[in-house]
């Protein structure tokens, strides 16, 4: 994996990265490069980047995939590097998580592409750090640093859980979410449209024995709605362990923890077996950029995980060029709905001739 522009900016300044270092949500394999010169740990919330570091040989005893950092993994870091997340709430969460892990006088490094909103993050750094300032900038990226000069509050994971009641498609659900999870704290418009359309669909009458996959589960709203509607056990998949934790919390809040199987996966890599139904409001961004490769890879692989005559339901912004990709993957598709800027597509695993 080539280093992206943000990591290249860190390379320009790595003479300052010495001692014991933690990377929070690295976006490429730069932690491995730096580990040849320093004592480096990496905390990932994305299965994709976790797998990338494993593949290149990063020490697995210093590499962690989790929604929160456990103290037994390490503390007293000299430097902690955070890659600017798209969601500002997730940056707040990461800062609250890692500040207690930083030794007094230690340094936080925040690096991000200008499009990520990093320019507006200085105030967030100043809330817990001193001597905050711009260290460097290049290739439309910025690097800020700040020092820990004051005591910090212990991190309490439960303080970051958002819980609310949501009415959707004939059901009242208790939903839980965490910073950075898709649709955090609210009902996504596309999901609302999808569930209302599925509520009218013939297959929803009797599928308690069906295998159903929710791809890109977010806070678990689709998975929970499907379980309540059908009685089926749902497999919920996401690349983000924050999303998987939110889904776990959502099912627990509705007293149906045993009704879901959670899978952390880059695309469908970790999926075994076949499903009668796959339902998805798929991601179409890599960072801040539209990225068709995520959906294209998913559509091309999903046919390997559909039963004979198995069905796929997709909701998407109607400007996304999904129809030709669906046709290439499944041979054909049907558009079930188009309005309000969204479309719902239906595909089926072709019967063998």
Curated annotation (Swiss-Prot):
Q: Which UniProt keywords apply?
A: Cytoplasm, Methyltransferase, rRNA processing, S-adenosyl-L-methionine, Transferase
Q: Does the keyword Amino-acid biosynthesis apply?
A: no
Instruction: List the GO molecular function terms.
Output: 16S rRNA (guanine(1207)-N(2))-methyltransferase activity; nucleic acid binding
Subcellular location, record wording: Cytoplasm
Write down the EC number.
2.1.1.172
| Catalytic function, reaction form | guanosine(1207) in 16S rRNA + S-adenosyl-L-methionine = N(2)-methylguanosine(1207) in 16S rRNA + S-adenosyl-L-homocysteine + H(+)
Please indicate if the UniProt record lists Transferase as a keyword.
Answer: yes
Question: One Gene Ontology cellular component annotation?
Answer: cytoplasm
**Which EC class, in a word?**
transferase
Give the principal location in a single coarse category. cytoplasm
Q: How does it assemble?
A: Monomer.
Q: What does this protein do?
A: Specifically methylates the guanine in position 1207 of 16S rRNA in the 30S particle.
Family named by the database record: Belongs to the methyltransferase superfamily. RsmC family.
The protein here is known as Ribosomal RNA small subunit methyltransferase C
Kindly list the organism's lineage: Bacteria, Pseudomonadati, Pseudomonadota, Gammaproteobacteria, Oceanospirillales
State the encoding gene.
rsmC
């Amino acid at each position: 994996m080539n280093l992206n522009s943000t990591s290249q900016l860190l390379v320009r300044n790595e003479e300052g990265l010495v001692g014991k270092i933690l990377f929070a949500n690295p976006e490429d394999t730069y932690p491995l490069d730096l580990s040849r010169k320093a004592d480096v740990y990496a905390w990932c919330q994305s299965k994709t980047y976790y797998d990338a570091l494993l593949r290149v040989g990063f020490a697995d005893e210093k590499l962690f995939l989790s929604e929160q950092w456990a103290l037994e993994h390490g503390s007293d870091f000299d430097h902690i590097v955070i890659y600017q997340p798209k969601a500002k709430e997730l940056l707040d969460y990461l800062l609250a998580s890692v500040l207690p892990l930083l030794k007094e006088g230690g340094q936080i490094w925040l690096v991000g592409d200008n499009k990520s909103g990093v320019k507006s993050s200085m105030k967030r750094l100043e809330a817990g750090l001193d001597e905050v300032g711009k260290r460097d900038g290049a290739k439309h990226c910025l690097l800020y640093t700040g020092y820990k000069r004051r005591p910090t509050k212990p991190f309490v994971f439960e303080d970051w859980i958002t819980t609310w009641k949501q009415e959707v498609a004939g059901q009242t659900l208790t939903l839980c979410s965490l910073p950075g999870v898709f649709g955090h704290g609210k009902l996504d418009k596309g999901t609302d449209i999808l569930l209302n359309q599925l509520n009218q669909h013939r297959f929803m009458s009797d599928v308690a024995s069906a295998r159903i996959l929710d791809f890109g589960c977010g806070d678990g709203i689709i998975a929970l709605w499907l379980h309540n509607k059908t009685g089926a056990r749902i497999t919920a998949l996401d690349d983000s362990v924050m999303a998987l934790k939110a889904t776990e919390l959502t099912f627990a809040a509705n007293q149906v923890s045993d009704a879901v199987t959670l899978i952390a996966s880059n695309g469908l890599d970790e999926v075994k077996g076949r499903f009668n139904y796959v339902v998805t409001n798929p991601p179409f961004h890599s960072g801040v950029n539209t990225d068709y490769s995520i959906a294209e890879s998913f559509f091309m692989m999903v046919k390997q995980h559909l039963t004979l005559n198995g069905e796929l339901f997709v909701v998407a912004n109607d400007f996304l060029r999904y129809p030709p990709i669906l046709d290439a993957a499944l041979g054909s598709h049907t558009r079930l709905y188009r309005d309000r800027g969204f479309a719902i597509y239906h595909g089926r695993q072709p019967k063998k001739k």
